From Swiss-Prot:
Pathway: Glycolipid biosynthesis; glycosylphosphatidylinositol-anchor biosynthesis. Its main location: endoplasmic reticulum. The keyword Iron-sulfur does not apply. One of its GO terms (biological process) is fungal-type cell wall organization. It comes from the Eukaryota. Its EC number is 2.4.1.-. The keyword NADP does not apply. Keywords: Cell wall biogenesis/degradation, Endoplasmic reticulum, Glycosyltransferase, GPI-anchor biosynthesis, Membrane, Transferase, Transmembrane, Transmembrane helix. The chain crosses the membrane at residues 5-25, 79-99, 111-131, 133-149, 161-181, 194-214, 267-287, 311-331, 335-355, 362-382. Residues 1-4, 100-110, 150-160, 215-266, 332-334, 383-403 are cytoplasmic. This is GPI mannosyltransferase 1. The gene is GPI14. It is a multi-pass membrane protein.
Length: 403
């Protein structure tokens, strides 16, 4: 690690400390809390675990029990904010892995700028210091890719299986990862290709099923229903960025049981898109391109998801530095794209403010139109990303080593 990278790491740590301390101050002195509402759910679920009970005794806890186990120290040491410190550590480690992978592909100066997109990103910092657990998943995914690049497929598979156990969505990465491994080992013969694929596949499956079986043995069907099955029929009535939100809300309002039939089919266009974008790795089956494909694939997944909040943006922001390291998009067009992405968010947030803090009924047309604008913008951005990723790039040192 160079002096500049040490400086960036220290600065990013200090900024997070500042956000963390300000959050504690805001919680104590302002009506609007800094702490994420989900953190209270994690904290309460951890209390039940600490008392020898099920985390699902806490209403609205819809996650793996491992997450509640992670916050048990909150109650052991008697400090409410300790879990946030844990999430910030995962956040920083994620940034360090990004730094490691970027340094193998581009110049140090450019890498330093791109690393800052994660390490000094106020959105990323806010999400982890507010007590959102996305940094844990991001760290697991980055470690998966780190060991994948080194061809340590068993370890990569274990971490990948753990990632899917934490949240289902990383399973979409299996297609581009399989394509990368298949082509990465093409010079070593079909037997090596098959062995490598079986290695990561079996280690992933064993870890995923092992974690699932262990949690099922401890917490029973409640674990399966709350951690996994719930998300298949989920209809989130709370306002969020998704264009599906209003449609699902209106559809469920017409049903006696409050469930939406539309919710069952909302994932179809999303599934088709992630399958197609995942196959973009065939276009250029290198490790650098794999990281770019994962960005595009995750962007498509979040854009078409039936629930979309700011924390979901972190899912693809971990790949943004890698995408930008090989992009052909000029700075003027890039600035326009960023402005549209931020601007349409701002329009939606203004409507959300009127609804949540002023109690105004802006569901329609205000909030709905804002969601449509954000969705259309993201669809256009997705098209630009796909077009850009199909342009051939020169192989880097890291790709030559892999091949």
């Amino acid at each position: 690690m160079t002096g500049e990278e040490w400086g960036l790491t220290v600065l990013s740590f200090l900024v997070r400390v500042g956000f963390f301390l300000f959050g504690i101050y805001q919680d104590a002195n302002f009506k609007v809390r800094y702490t994420d509402i989900d953190y209270f759910v994690f904290h309460d679920a951890a209390k039940y675990v600490y008392e020898g009970k099920s985390p699902y005794a806490r209403d609205t806890y819809r996650y793996t029990p491992l997450l509640s186990w992670l916050l048990v120290p909150n109650h052991y040491f008697g400090w409410f904010h300790l879990g946030k410190v844990i999430f910030v550590i995962f956040d920083l480690v994620t940034g360090l892995i990004i730094m490691k992978l970027l340094n193998q592909a581009i110049s140090r100066k450019r890498a330093l700028i791109l690393e800052s997109i994660w390490l000094l990103n106020p959105m990323v910092i806010t999400i982890s210091t507010r007590g959102n657990a996305e940094s844990v998943l991001c760290c697991l995914i980055m470690f998966t890719l780190f060991f994948l690049q080194k061809s340590r497929y068993t370890l990569a598979g274990i971490l990948y299986g753990l990632s899917i156990h934490f949240k289902i969505y990383p399973i979409i990465y299996c297609i581009p990862i399989a394509i990368f491994i298949y082509y990465n080992k093409r010079n070593q013969g079909p037997r090596t290709q098959l062995t490598s694929l079986l290695n990561i596949g079996l280690s992933t499956l064993t870890t995923l099923l092992g974690c699932g079986w262990a949690m099922y043995k401890i917490y029973g069907y409640e674990f399966l229903d709350q951690a996994y099955l719930y998300h298949l029929y989920r209809t989130d009535h709370r306002h969020n960025f998704s264009v599906w939100n209003m449609l699902l809300y209106l559809d469920s309002a017409n049903k006696e049981n409050g469930e939406s039939n539309l919710s069952r089919y909302a994932f179809v266009p999303q599934l088709l898109l992630v399958l197609v974008t995942g196959c973009l790795e065939w276009w250029n089956p290198t490790f650098d391109n794999l990281l770019r494909v994962l960005f595009v694939q995750t962007f498509a997944f979040v854009t078409y998801n039936k629930v979309c909040t700011s924390q979901y943006f972190v899912w693809y922001l971990i790949f943004l530095p890698f995408y930008l390291s090989r992009t052909h998009i000029g700075w003027k067009k890039g600035l326009l794209m960023a402005t549209l992405w931020v601007g349409t968010q701002g329009i939606w947030l203004s409507q959300g403010y009127y609804l949540e803090f002023e109690g105004k009924n802006v569901f329609y047309p205000g909030l709905f139109i804002a969601s449509v604008l954000f969705f259309v913008t993201n669809v256009w951005l997705l098209g630009q990303f796909i077009t850009d990723i199909k342009i051939p790039t020169q192989p880097t040192v890291s790709n030559k080593k892999n091949n």
